[in-house]
């Protein structure tokens, strides 16, 4: 019986990539979106690509970041899936290689209480181009899930996870039910279930 569901955020619970949205607003969209694409396909080191992408945001207004973060579009079916999981008493957590500035408003909207992500460093309301946080490496989600399972006294087969990119592989390895949602091939090959319709309600049919 599933007791915990771990979600990726960008391109999973949220319809898009937070860093690409921020970069576009900062006039750096083309530079960052290509790096994001290669990183999520597993063709670049996640830590190095994250640092490089965030460096392009240097000079951006932090107030603007918060404004954009509060209006990120949720994936179709997100509300319905979260409500379904809650009705089954399944605990929900977000693991994001993105930013708290994006996931925190979404957590409020969806009624999710726990999320792990990174923080955009800023000084005098201006991004410095630096980043820190809990999910900065390709293995971060796996290590975080190990700790969470231990803390909650859960077995691997009591955990499901939903993701789309290469940095979700590590949490797949710690999960009993692995769901690839509109995912890159590197993740699809390791999944128990692949959902190719861009609607999170499809997951309700298979769990």
UniProtKB/Swiss-Prot annotation:
Membrane-spanning segments: none
Record-listed Mg(2+) binding positions: 8, 10, 164
Gene Ontology CC: cytoplasm
InterPro entries xref list: HAD-like_SerB (IPR050582), HAD-like_sf (IPR036412), HAD_sf (IPR023214), PSP (IPR004469)
Top enzyme class: hydrolase
EC number: 3.1.3.3
Keywords: Amino-acid biosynthesis, Hydrolase, Magnesium, Metal-binding, Serine biosynthesis
Swiss-Prot/TrEMBL catalytic activity: O-phospho-L-serine + H2O = L-serine + phosphate; O-phospho-D-serine + H2O = D-serine + phosphate
Stored CDD domains: HAD_PSP (cd07500)
Gene Ontology MF annotations: L-phosphoserine phosphatase activity; magnesium ion binding
Active-site residues annotated for this sequence: 8 (nucleophile), 10 (proton donor)
Any GO BP: L-serine biosynthetic process
Family the entry assigns: Belongs to the HAD-like hydrolase superfamily. SerB family.
Protein name per the record: Phosphoserine phosphatase
Organism: Campylobacter jejuni subsp. doylei (strain ATCC BAA-1458 / RM4099 / 269.97)
Phylogenetic lineage: Bacteria, Pseudomonadati, Campylobacterota, Epsilonproteobacteria, Campylobacterales
